[in-house]
Amino acid sequence: MEKCEGIVIRQTSYRESDKIVRMYTREFGKIGVVARGAKKTKSRLAAVTQLFTNGYFTFFGGNGLGTLQQGEVIENFSSIQQDIFMTAYATYVCELLDKATEERQPNPYLYELTFQILRDIDEGYDPQILTQIYEMKMLPVLGLYPTMDKCAICGETTGHFDFSTRSNGIICHRCFEKDRYRMHLPENVVKLLRLFFIFQLDRLGNIDVKQETKDWLQKAIDTYYDENSGLYLKSRKFLRDMDKWENMLKKDSDD
């Protein structure tokens, strides 16, 4: 019998009343368990196996699917559960984590990062910025290490910088002519990309960013992921459509 602290990142129906639950845990990394009877509303496993739930879990099992015996909810992130926009961002965070990691490879830092991101989304901090921070933090997990602290070509740390997927990082104005396909980004966007990649989440504080800046950030991050990660995430397309819808609603309310 194993015990762990984990976050439910995916659930699927299994047979008439069971679920297969994918969790990312502090102790074991990503694991899968069968939760028998969890689809029944009166089941003792119903609440603890809801998507995004953070809890303590006890299960039997080895390298394959385990069997969940019991669970205790630590945090169910109720605000996320009740808000369609928050849900979309949290779903993307969990799918990215699922696709970027292998079974049973513990990474306590990644567990804590995911928990902090979900908690901050639930508490009402900007979900788009939090998700962008998470995307930048996940790059090393995917084996991607863009050069963000100096020019990726010449190594200079001063000057004007653009972002280059071809050169795998930022490049200074001295090297612009070496990559005509580079992304010309506003200076504050380059600084934020660097901050998101290098600084710890708890040191960033509450960042107030204009929508135009967030759009630039998203363009740069999406381009880098598309050209380097090899991932296709269904939740990302849905999330981008949601972003457009949310921006339209905000614009209408401001008029």
Swiss-Prot record:
Keywords: DNA damage, DNA recombination, DNA repair
Top-level lineage group: Bacteria
Segments forming a coiled coil: none
UniProt-listed InterPro entries: ARFGAP/RecO (IPR037278), DNA_rep/recomb_RecO_N (IPR022572), NA-bd_OB-fold (IPR012340), RecO (IPR003717), RecO_C (IPR042242)
Gene3D superfamilies with a match to the protein in the record: Nucleic acid-binding proteins, Recombination protein O, C-terminal domain
Key word Methyltransferase present: no
GO BP term (any one): DNA recombination
GO cellular component: bacterial nucleoid
Pfam families referenced in this protein's UniProt entry, alphabetically: RecO_C, RecO_N
Function comment: Involved in DNA repair and RecF pathway recombination.
Stated family: Belongs to the RecO family.
PANTHER family named among the record's database cross-references: DNA REPAIR PROTEIN RECO
Protein name as it appears in the record: DNA repair protein RecO
Classification of source organism: Bacteria, Bacillati, Bacillota, Bacilli, Bacillales
